[in-house]
């Protein structure tokens, strides 16, 4: 019978190593997809509605948010690239358990969407945006995450040396 002891050294399980170079390649591609989808949602599809609702919450807030400078845009681009990298890294980590392919990439996207939706719900709870806009953003964000995750997963491959 084996006892539980916190003093024993951990035995490392033998598994597949994550192919970091493919995570980087897939992550950049997924980040580019996220950037394009963010531009569509924030700059085109929901721009006027978001501006109006933000101005209703605090006069001038929506106008200020819509006039972003290069530093703000660069920060958002970097954030999307980081999200893309995390999507692909998570896909690589989940791949041995769920298998390669779009199904696992969609699972990854769902995990990120759930956390993102919980965090984003704060804007609705504070009254900054309506529940309708929050739901619209949430659906669009789910589509963006699924597309980005699938693109990143498509580019991610395990090296024969790491499997």
What is each stretch, according to the model?
Residues 2-163:
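Juxtamembrane/disordered regions of integral membrane proteins
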């Amino acid at each position: 019978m084996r006892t539980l002891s916190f003093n024993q050294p951990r035995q490392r399980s033998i598994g597949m190593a994550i192919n970091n170079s493919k995570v980087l390649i897939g992550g950049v591609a997924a980040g580019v997809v996220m950037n394009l989808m963010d531009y569509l949602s924030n700059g085109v599809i929901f721009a006027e509605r978001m501006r109006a609702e933000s101005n209703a919450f605090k006069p001038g807030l929506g106008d200020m948010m819509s006039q972003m400078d290069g530093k703000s845009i660069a920060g958002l681009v970097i954030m999307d690239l980081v999200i893309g990298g995390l999507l692909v890294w998570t896909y690589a980590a989940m791949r041995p358990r769920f298998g390669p392919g779009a199904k696992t990439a969609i699972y990854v996207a769902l995990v990120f969407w759930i956390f993102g939706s919980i965090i984003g719900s704060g804007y609705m709870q504070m009254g900054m945006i309506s529940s309708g806009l929050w739901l619209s953003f949430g659906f669009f964000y789910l589509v963006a995450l699924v597309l980005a995750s699938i693109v990143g997963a498509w580019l991610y491959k395990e090296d024969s040396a790491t499997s």
